């Protein structure tokens, strides 16, 4: 018999009754029923109930054990009485009568319990993450993650992709976030960077003549934390393909992601229709470039109904160039109480409020419009709005106005809140959409032209498009949205040096700077580069969706906290003076 176990804690069943066995694991919990001890022994695979009475040679020793001690049990498999069978356990038909016990690893008093799902402060959970990971829910999440990665690999290999590894220490590259810099000991004053993504390397793989590449790639970005984003590092399914257009990438990716969600989606419906939605339409209809299509609400522009109307705030606002009034339909939301609640929500988001109209049955039995806006713009305009939005009695509509960029994000959040409050957002399904035609450029906080997304994407229209207004240039850039999250981002790459130089020039990077920062890739493009494109899927976020978790840290084995600190390992930490001298660095005190 093996030194530690003959079986795992999920293998024993009625067929093993009468056998002598050996099990090892953690003490999940102990119950003393008047001279009979019941002990749940847990390992990676499951739980087995162990019993000992006063006649057992192991009884005295078992009385001393506490939760989370690691022990080895010798004993005999017994059938449970029919009334005591536990159908929730794989081993619920049997129990092991203990004849011997050894302590393999004692445990101090626990800072947080493993048994049960008691909610503990995140700081405590992350400081003792190794204990936190023993809890059933987190253990399941990590196994889900492992199985998702395995499935992704199998699906990519099955689709004819080849897995290659790229460097994880390289040169700094402006890709939209701050780099983590690594000082060079051999080259004082110079720094490497941890890659924000394998972007340049995967493109070089295409230039090198390989056709379909993928890897499960670690990425490093010094970002502000969010519930759906790690502040330091994450993993992505990185993909690149040669001789492809946008639709070719979509056709390769959809079977992989759709199949993955069907495999691990716990029976939730996975929509097979993945619409293409232009970025501008997504912002107009949903107030987001990662719309949740489970919510049927679609916003519309209703400016014509307020221009020159009696509602002076909107009428005057529309006299300014680039402004509009947008409506958020709210089917079944036609009560003043609900409208006031949503108005308060808008105020909590930093807006002065939202105007609203709701339709109800009047005293004469006919439908009438109510609310402050209805009184100001009159029945003809309110009826025109109702017809445009397709609303009826018992429905409502909310209104925001201004330049779209000033209110779209809040309008999107209001749409989400309205759909949730009214029960309009469909549960138990995954709905996907490709967001396409992203703007290539945007203005930064200082009013300068900058890349809005990936700087390596091909502009639609090529060089000719770059000769016009940069803010009107669309890129072959696309995202995949699912249930309100961005799962994938990608693009068709700019593989022609002259177009690349022009694209970067418009964003303020002279040719010399591009040569310096991306010299390897520019050089490669001069030696025969194929048209190519690809994308990257966020694995952490995919697992978060599949696990139905609201916080990405629940699906990462050892995550940082919201201040980008590793409380278990004590990172970041102060370097020693010797380390600083070796790197020829010194720490400058804060002012």
From Swiss-Prot:
Binding site for ATP: 221-223, 486, 538-541
EC number(s) reported in the record: 6.1.1.23
Main location: cytoplasm
Region (Aspartate): 199-202
Broad EC category: ligase
UniProt KW Aminoacyl-tRNA synthetase keyword: yes
GO molecular function: aspartate-tRNA ligase activity; aspartate-tRNA(Asn) ligase activity; ATP binding; nucleic acid binding
Binding residue positions for L-aspartate: 175, 221, 453, 493
Coiled coil spans: none
Alphabetized UniProt keyword annotations: Aminoacyl-tRNA synthetase, ATP-binding, Cytoplasm, Ligase, Nucleotide-binding, Protein biosynthesis
Catalytic activity: tRNA(Asx) + L-aspartate + ATP = L-aspartyl-tRNA(Asx) + AMP + diphosphate
Protein localization: Cytoplasm
Function: Aspartyl-tRNA synthetase with relaxed tRNA specificity since it is able to aspartylate not only its cognate tRNA(Asp) but also tRNA(Asn). Reaction proceeds in two steps: L-aspartate is first activated by ATP to form Asp-AMP and then transferred to the acceptor end of tRNA(Asp/Asn).
NCBIfam families, per the entry: aspS_bact, PRK00476.1
Official protein name in the record: Aspartate--tRNA(Asp/Asn) ligase
Organism placement in taxonomy: Bacteria, Pseudomonadati, Pseudomonadota, Alphaproteobacteria, Rhodobacterales
Gene: aspS
């Amino acid at each position: 018999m093996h030194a530690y176990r003959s079986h795992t804690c999920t293998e024993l069943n009625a067929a093993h009754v009468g056998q002598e066995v050996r099990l090892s694991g953690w003490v999940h919990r102990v119950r003393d029923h008047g001279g009979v001890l019941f002990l749940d022994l847990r390992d990676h695979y499951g739980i087995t109930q162990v019993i000992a009475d006063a006649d057992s040679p192991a009884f005295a020793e078992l009385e001393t054990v506490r939760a989370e001690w690691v022990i080895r049990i010798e004993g005999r498999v017994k059938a449970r009485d029919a009334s005591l069978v536990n159908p929730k356990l794989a081993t619920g038909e049997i129990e092991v009568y203990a004849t011997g016990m050894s302590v393999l690893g004692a445990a101090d008093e626990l800072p947080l319990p493993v048994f049960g799902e008691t909610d503990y402060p995140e700081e405590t959970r992350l400081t003792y993450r190794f204990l936190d990971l023993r809890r059933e829910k987190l253990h399941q999440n990590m196994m889900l993650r492992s199985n998702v990665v395995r499935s992704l690999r199998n699906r990519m290999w099955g689709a004819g992709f080849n897995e290659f590894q790229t460097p994880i220490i390289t040169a700094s590259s402006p890709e939209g976030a701050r780099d983590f810099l690594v000082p060079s000991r051999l080259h004082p004053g110079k720094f490497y960077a941890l890659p924000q993504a394998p972007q340049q390397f995967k493109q070089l793989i295409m230039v090198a003549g390989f056709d379909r590449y993928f890897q499960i790639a670690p990425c490093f970005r010094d970002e502000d934390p969010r519930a759906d984003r790690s502040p330091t590092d994450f993993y992505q399914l990185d993909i690149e393909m040669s001789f492809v257009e946008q639709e070719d990438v979509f056709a390769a990716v959809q079977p992989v992601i759709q199949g993955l969600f069907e495999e691990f989606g716990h029976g939730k419906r996975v929509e097979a229709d993945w619409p293409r939605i232009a970025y501008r339409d997504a912002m107009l209809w949903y107030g987001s470039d990662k719309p949740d299509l489970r919510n049927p609400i679609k916003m519309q522009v209703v400016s014509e109904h307020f221009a020159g109307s009696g509602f002076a705030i909107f009428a005057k606002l529309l006299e300014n160039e680039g402004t509009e009034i947008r409506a958020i339909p709210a089917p079944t939301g036609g009560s003043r109480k609900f409208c006031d609640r949503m108005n308060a929500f808008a105020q909590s988001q930093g807006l002065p409020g939202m105007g609203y109209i709701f339709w109800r049955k009047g005293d004469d039995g006919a439908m009438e419009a109510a609310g402050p806006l209805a009184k100001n713009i009159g029945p003809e305009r309110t009826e025109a709005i109702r017809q445009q939005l397709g609303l009826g009695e018992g429905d409502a509509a909310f209104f925001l106005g201004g330049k779209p960029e000033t209110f779209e994000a809040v309008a999107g959040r209001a749409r989400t809140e309205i759909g949730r409050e009214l029960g309009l957002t469909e549960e138990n399904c995954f709905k996907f959409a490709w967001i396409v035609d992203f703007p290539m450029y945007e203005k930064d906080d200082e009013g300068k032209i900058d890349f809005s997304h990936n700087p390596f994407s091909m502009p639609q229209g090529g060089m000719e498009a770059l000769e016009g207004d940069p803010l009107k240039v669309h890129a072959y850039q696309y995202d995949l949205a699912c249930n309100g999250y961005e799962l994938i981002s990608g693009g068709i790459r700019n593989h022609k040096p002259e177009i690349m130089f022009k694209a970067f020039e418009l964003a303020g990077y002279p040719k010399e700077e591009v040569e310096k920062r991306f010299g390897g890739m520019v050089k490669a493009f001069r030696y025969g580069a194929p048209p190519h494109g690809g994308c990257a899927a966020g694995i952490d976020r995919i697992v978060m969706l599949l696990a139905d978790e609201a916080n990405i840290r629940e699906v990462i084995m050892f995550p940082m906290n919201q201040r980008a600190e590793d409380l278990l390992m004590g990172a970041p930490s102060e370097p020693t003076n010797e380390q600083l001298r070796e790197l020829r660095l010194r720490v400058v005190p804060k002012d």
